[in-house]
A protein has these predicted regions:
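N-terminal leader/auxiliary helical segments
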Residues: 1-190
Length: 192
C-alpha cells in the first residue's frame, strides 16, 4: 500500500488525498523533519515512533525500487502499479500465500486512537480525516481484491468507464503472473 492519505475519499480529488500525492513527490526531509517533532511531542511516543519507522521503511523501499521500476516501465511498457503489484504477488507466492485471496491491508486497523497518533504527521489533516483515510484504505483494498472472475470483470470495466483503467488496472492482482513482469520481479528481489 502507499501513503495513507491517498485513500481519503479516494474516488474524488480533495486537499487530503492531494497532500498524499504531493508528499510522494517531496524530498523525505520534509516529512522526517516534521516527524521528529511529532514523535518528540507525542503523548504515546512508542506509537508515534512505530508509525514514523513504518514510514521510513516505505520511504526506503520506494527510494530503492522506484528508479528500477520506472526504467522497467520504459523498457517493458507495463505500468508502474502493475510492476509493483506483480512483485508483491511474487513475494506472496514465495511465502505460500495466494495473492488473489490474501487481503493485503489486513494489518490496517482503523480506530480513533490510531488516527490520533497518525494525524499530527500530516499538516492540516484532522483526526477524523485520518480515520476516514484508514477506513478508505480498507474499502479500496477490498474493492481491488477480485478473486472472483465476475468481480474482476466488474472492477476493471468500472475503471474503463471512469477513465482510470490505464493508471489503476495494475492494482488488481492478475490471476496468473504477467510474463512481462517475471524478469522485473526477479530483479526487484535481488535489489532489496
Amino acid at each position: 500500500s502507499d501513503l495513507l492519505m491517498f485513500y481519503y475519499k479516494a474516488l474524488q480529488s480533495n486537499p487530503v488525498n492531494r497532500l498524499g500525492n504531493a508528499m510522494h513527490e517531496q524530498k523525505g526531509e520534509v516529512f522526517f523533519t516534521r516527524a521528529r517533532t511529532v514523535v518528540e511531542n507525542a503523548p504515546d511516543k512508542d506509537a508515534a515512533l512505530a508509525y514514523a519507522l513504518g514510514f521510513v521503511c516505505h520511504f526506503a523501499l520506494d527510494s530503492t525500487c522506484h528508479p528500477y521500476v520506472e526504467a522497467y516501465v520504459r523498457e517493458s511498457g507495463v505500468g508502474h502499479c502493475e510492476i509493483e503489484t506483480e512483485f508483491d504477488n511474487a513475494l506472496m507466492r514465495e511465502d505460500g500465500l495466494d495473492p488473489i485471496k490474501f487481503f493485503t491491508a489486513s494489518h490496517i486497523k482503523p480506530s480513533r486512537e490510531r488516527a490520533e497518533v497518525i494525524a499530527p504527521f500530516y499538516e492540516g489533516v484532522t483526526v477524523d480525516e485520518t480515520l476516514a483515510a484508514m477506513k478508505g484504505m480498507i474499502t479500496v483494498h477490498h474493492l481491488l481484491q477480485a478473486a472472483n472472475p465476475v468481480k474482476r470483470w466488474v472492477v476493471l470495466t468500472g475503471m474503463r468507464v471512469a477513465g482510470k483503467y490505464e493508471f489503476m488496472h495494475g492494482l488488481v492482482a492478475n490471476p496468473q503472473p504477467n510474463p512481462k513482469c517475471v524478469q522485473s520481479s526477479q530483479k526487484d528481489r535481488k535489489s532489496t
